[in-house]
Amino acid sequence: MQNMVILGATGSIGASTLSVISANPFAYSVYGLVANASVDKMLALCVAHKPKVAHMVDEAAAKQLRAVLPATLNIQVTTGMNDLLGLVTAAEVDTVMAAIVGAAGLVPTLEAVKAGKRVLLANKEALVMSGELFIEATKRSGAVLLPVDSEHNAIFQCLPQEVQANLGRCDLAASGISHILLTGSGGPFLRSDLATLAAMTPAQACKHPNWSMGPKISVDSATMMNKGLEFIEARWLFNTQAEQLKVVIHPQSVIHSMVQYRDGSVIAQMGNPDMRTPIAHCMAYPQRIHSGVEPLDFFKVGQLSFYEPDFERFPCLALAMEACAQGQEATTVLNAANEIAVEAFLQGQIGFTQIAKVNEACLVTVPKRPMGSIEDILALDAQTRVYARETLASIA
C-alpha cells in the first residue's frame, strides 16, 4: 500500500489521480490532500477519500474548512509553508503527486525530492525554473522521479531502461537515440486566421479540441507556451542537446510523443487523450494498473497528421526555445512573465497576442544573474513578476 500526498488535489490532475486511486483501492491510500483555497471542493474530497491531512495554502480557507469538516472524520487541517513541507517529507508518505500549477509548486516539490520520495512530476515549472538544482537534488537524495506530463511520460515509455533509470543524467547518444520528437496538438487556434488571434477571448482559448485542462494550462496550449515549457522540461529530464529535441504539431493528440533511434527506428506511445493513463503509469511503474481509460480503437482513429510549428502563429514557442538555449536564468524569467501575462489575459486586462509581447519584453529586459540556490531562483522570479506587471500597465 502506497501512501500518497496530492499537491493540487482540487485541480484536473488531482481529480484524475484520485480517480486512479479509487480504481485501485487496495494499492494506494490518500495520506494528504493539498489545495489553495477551494473549500467546497476540498470538503467533498475529504469526505470521499478520508485523508490524514488536508492542507490549505490560504489561511482563511483552512479556517473555513475546519469549521465545516465533520469531526468524526478525524482529519488534520493545516496551513502555512512549514506544515506543507512537513507533509511532503513525512516518514509515512511514499509518493508525492506534484500537480500544483506554476511557480507555487516549486518549493514543496523540491523538498519532496530532497526527502527521497517517489515524486510524480506534473508541475513542469519545477524544472523550468530550477532544472540543474532539481536534478542534482534528485541525484543526491536518491528520489525516484517520474514524469506525468503526457508527452514526457510518452517519451519515458519509449526509452530503454538504462535511460529511464538515469533521468537528468542519461546519455541519449550512447543509447542509440538520435532525436526526441515532442508532439503537440497546436491548440484551438491552429487553423485560425492570424488576423483574428488578437481578438480571441479567454473562453475561446480555454476550449481545447482534445484535452480537458485548467484555465492556465489551456491558455498556454493555445499560445503553445505549454509546449515551450515542455521543451525546456525535456531538456532537463532527458539531458538533451538542442539538436536532439524537435517539436511536431500533431492535431489528433493520438501519438503523445516519439523517440527516434540511430538505426532509423521510431518508437511512439499512443493512446486516448486522458491524463489518467500517464498518471496510472507513474503510480505503478514499473508495473501496470487499471487507469479507467478505454484503449485506443485504431478503426476509429482515422488520419494522423503532422506539421512543423509555425513560429509566426506561435511566438511563445519560439521564445521558450530561445530561453532554453540561453540557460536557466532565461527560462526562470520567461516562466514568471508568462504566469503574469496569462493571468492578465484571463482577467481581460490584455489581448491574446499581447501575452507574447509581455514575455518577450521580460526576456529581453530583466537582468539575468547566476543562480546557485533556490533563494536566487525565487528572487529572480519575484523581480520578473514586478517588471511584467509594469509592462502590463504600459500596454493595457
From Swiss-Prot:
Keyword list, A-Z: Isoprene biosynthesis, Manganese, Metal-binding, NADP, Oxidoreductase
Pfam families with a match to the protein in the record: DXP_redisom_C (PF08436), DXP_reductoisom (PF02670), DXPR_C (PF13288)
Single Gene Ontology BP annotation: isopentenyl diphosphate biosynthetic process, methylerythritol 4-phosphate pathway involved in terpenoid biosynthetic process
Pathway: Isoprenoid biosynthesis; isopentenyl diphosphate biosynthesis via DXP pathway; isopentenyl diphosphate from 1-deoxy-D-xylulose 5-phosphate: step 1/6
Cofactor(s) essential for the protein: Mg(2+); Mn(2+)
Binding residue positions for 1-deoxy-D-xylulose 5-phosphate: K124, S150, E151, S185, H208, S221, N226, K227, E230
Enzyme class: oxidoreductase
InterPro entries: DXP_reductoisomerase, DXP_reductoisomerase_C, DXP_reductoisomerase_N, DXPR_C, DXPR_C_sf, NAD(P)-bd_dom_sf
The keyword 4Fe-4S belongs to this UniProt entry's keyword annotation: no
Catalytic activity annotation: 2-C-methyl-D-erythritol 4-phosphate + NADP(+) = 1-deoxy-D-xylulose 5-phosphate + NADPH + H(+)
Function, in words: Catalyzes the NADPH-dependent rearrangement and reduction of 1-deoxy-D-xylulose-5-phosphate (DXP) to 2-C-methyl-D-erythritol 4-phosphate (MEP).
HAMAP family: DXP_reductoisom
Protein name: 1-deoxy-D-xylulose 5-phosphate reductoisomerase
Species the sequence originates in: Shewanella baltica (strain OS195)
Species lineage: Bacteria, Pseudomonadati, Pseudomonadota, Gammaproteobacteria, Alteromonadales
